[in-house]
Amino acid sequence: MKHHKSMRTLGRERNQRRALLKSLSASLIEEKKIKTTLARARELRPVMDKLVTLSKKGNVNAIRLLYAKVGRDNAKKLVGEIAISYKDRNGGYTRIIKLNPRKSDGALMAQIEFV
């Protein structure tokens, strides 16, 4: 039964799901916006909000956690550029825009981007 299971499985096991979200978050940090399925975008949103909140702290421990989550280059970009632009904002750092369904399989698509 699905009692108190807040996360979608995205058709993957736990390690694969973590790797997928790590890859999507790294891509979003690099590109500022990415196009993906709606379910993946909805799962990525809270992950990115937590990463941006963590990067706003800016202390050594937070930066080391960011290194582990998104890699060294992306962590530096997150702390150096993105966190500074959101210093006065308390959450809601990303927006999801629904797009037309994918032609091949009809999957609902969305664009997730920084506000």
Enumerate the language-model features and the residues they cover.
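Structured, basic alpha/beta domains of bacterial-type, RNA-associated proteins
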Residues: 1-12, 19, 23-115
